[in-house]
Amino acid sequence: MSRLKELRNYVDAEINKIEDPDKRTSAIAHLYGVSLAATMIAKKRGFDPEIAAMAAMLHDLHAYKTGSYDDHAHKGAELAREILGELKLTDGAETDMICSAIYHHDDKLVTDSPMDEVLKDADVIDHCLKDASKAVKEKEQARFDKLCAEFGMKDEVSVNEV
């Protein structure tokens, strides 16, 4: 079994513990959506798509498990380190890269390491494209516009248009 598949099985089991079916569905859709976007972005930029997908699968797990987004990026990085240590899927450098991306993913206005940026951008892609009726968050607009340019998306959506 691939490392990503093993991690997804673990995450699926954790998400399936969420009692509210709408929250459970939302969690699955977001984690898998960000994972797919992270894979695409990492491949385009020449980074490890498997590590990007693994970071994406774990990036909001703490929030889903606890129901709280309070400092969820930092707490999520700690949880990811525990999970990766338990499952023994990554070496130290890979674990550090994944945890750094999760730790920084909520600060969309700051530029961090390349893999951190892959996760931030994947999160923004999922937020902005999963429901076209919702406005792009102001803190995500500049990043989304850059992604539209990078991927040749001509119909850029702005906060003012929606």
For each predicted feature, which ranges?
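Divalent metal-dependent phosphate-bond-processing catalytic cores, especially two-metal-ion Mg2+/Mn2+ enzymes
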Residues: M1-E6, E19-F47, L58, E86-L89, ...
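His-Asp-centered metal-binding catalytic motifs of divalent-metal-dependent phosphohydrolases/nucleases
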Residues: P49-G67, H72, G76, M97-D106
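Short linear motifs at secondary-structure transitions and domain/linker junctions
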Residues: I28-Y32, G76-E78, G92-T95, A101-I102
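A contiguous binding-surface segment within folded domains or other stable secondary-structure elements
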Residues: G67-D71, A77-G85, L89-G92
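An amphipathic alpha-helix signature
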Residues: L4-D12, S35, H74-R81, C99
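Hydrophobic aliphatic residue packing
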Residues: V11, V34, A52, I98-I102, ...
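Residues at secondary-structure transition points
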Residues: T25-A29, A52, G67-D71, A93, ...
